[in-house]
Amino acid sequence: AKATGRLAKTDVLDAHVLAHFAEGVRPQPRAMPDAQARELTSILARRRQVVEMLTAEDNRLRRASNPVRKRIRAHIGWLERELTDINKDLGRIVKESPAWSEKDSLLRSTPGVGPILSITLLADLPELGSLNRKQIAALVGVAPLNRDSGTMRGKRTVWGGRARVRSA
């Protein structure tokens, strides 16, 4: 609302600002993810959390005193079993969907693409297959972007995009 010169902020004003934005910019409508896509995204997010916890516990184990090591090892064992179960769930969900199963097979036929990268791309980059490679690169945040103005020619840098896809 401030950009339009209004200092007040209410739901009604916000609705007007959003309507004005939609009129001028005409953003492309996007379909809401279905229940299966939300489930895949949710389980994949949990997988990332478990991997982070495993890394943290492994780091703690290196510095822990002997009495604490046994407990940390037990927790690492539990986290590894949890990770195995999560990976099985992710594979099951992908196999249950004919569209995902087909895309998964195609992605995994590429050298260097394993099950987790493939599932990450399916969950976090649903546009894959409907956009060209330059559009996908920009969406992920790996396409160099110009920073030019007038006679100034800036360095082409990559930024923004979907960090979860880049880190997969």
Question: What is each of the regions a protein language model found here?
Answer:
Residues A1-T110, I119-T120:
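Long, charge-rich intrinsically disordered scaffolds of nucleic-acid metabolism proteins
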Residues P115, T120-A168:
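Phosphate-backbone recognition surface of nucleic-acid-processing proteins
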